[in-house]
């Protein structure tokens, strides 16, 4: 079987949804910026691309009409490069990488670009219009339970306290703030030139330009005392708050995958090798524990044990679920989200899987860690995990 390797990649900084720096920027434009930069970082690659695979959790409105195809056009790819938008909710950006890698491993592709794009400013998490199947809603309402309420269910079922959740959130912000101060994300980020329209002093519209180059959700001054003052967000007597939950965000990311032999022939140094990907199902009402099912499956496919993994990028949808995943699998917390997670850095849904993969790659290189895992829970009661090996 052929080897699938990642040879380049780039992501935008993550913006806060609604009022952040990317709120007015279309998600397909963000995706195109990342695709162009990914090609540039692959030595200005102009050869064959078998497919463009883009993950998106809410593929409608600005993210509809097979957004991946539009991203390819905006990025200047020839019309001969096909494209597909994939949706497995929060794992979409990792699913896109897996689809591309598995095609390469089978010999069906030799080169593909995978990624994810999401604007939670322009397309809300549940979409503009939600129409549940009434029969399913009556028979199994947990399939329509809000993500926040599932986080509360995890906290109650597994005894994850408010204090533990807040402490985990503080750690996320502290690690992210330290990483930002040390410039750890600079190599994975492509700055975005943003144009906004404002009303000038003469009361007429005027355009304003700025360059957005750094994740903007991190709050370095966050403390447990500050977080303890926040009210529960989903249940009157609950423990899940805005402070110990992931932020709604905007962003995009992309990576180029290649057959190892082709990369070597072109003189492109592989960053990591794709080892495996797995998904698993769990009760929808505790969807946050999804990685508990997915990680062991992915490790088995890769022929590895938990102790072989040096770094984990575990999406922090909510502190309650991230804590329970770590506890149940017995993961060393010092290996998890060493540069912060979604509570501090944001969670742009369909982009997240690719974003986390890029962050993992760069930290694996810095630490010379052989194996790393990207994992997340998925709305509806699932988990996903991908295993990567440093080249």
Swiss-Prot record:
Q: What is the lineage of its organism?
A: Bacteria, Bacillati, Bacillota, Bacilli, Bacillales
- Annotated SUPFAM superfamilies: Thiolase-like (SSF53901)
Which named protein is this?
Answer: 3-ketoacyl-CoA thiolase
Q: What is its EC class?
A: transferase
Which InterPro entries does this chain map to? Thiolase, Thiolase-like, Thiolase-like_sf_Thiolase, Thiolase_acyl_enz_int_AS, Thiolase_AS, Thiolase_C, Thiolase_CS, Thiolase_N
The UniProt similarity line reads: Belongs to the thiolase-like superfamily. Thiolase family.
Q: Please tell me one Gene Ontology term that the record gives under cellular component.
A: cytoplasm
Q: Which reaction does it catalyse?
A: an acyl-CoA + acetyl-CoA = a 3-oxoacyl-CoA + CoA
* Associated pathway: Lipid metabolism; fatty acid beta-oxidation
Look up the record and give one Gene Ontology term from the biological process aspect.
fatty acid beta-oxidation
Q: Which organism is it from?
A: Bacillus subtilis (strain 168)
Q: What GO molecular function annotations does the UniProt record carry, in alphabetical order?
A: acetyl-CoA C-acyltransferase activity
Assigned keywords, A-Z: Acyltransferase, Fatty acid metabolism, Lipid degradation, Lipid metabolism, Transferase
Q: What does this protein do?
A: Involved in the degradation of long-chain fatty acids.
Q: What is its EC number?
A: 2.3.1.16
Query: From which domain of life does this come?
Result: Bacteria
What induces this protein's gene, according to its Swiss-Prot or TrEMBL record?
Repressed by FadR in the absence of LCFAs (fatty acids of 14-20 carbon atoms). When LCFAs are present in the medium, they are converted to long-chain acyl-CoAs, which antagonize FadR as to its binding to fadR boxes on target DNA and thus derepress transcription.
In the UniProt entry, which residues are flagged as the active site?
A: 90, 347, 377
Keyword match Transferase: yes
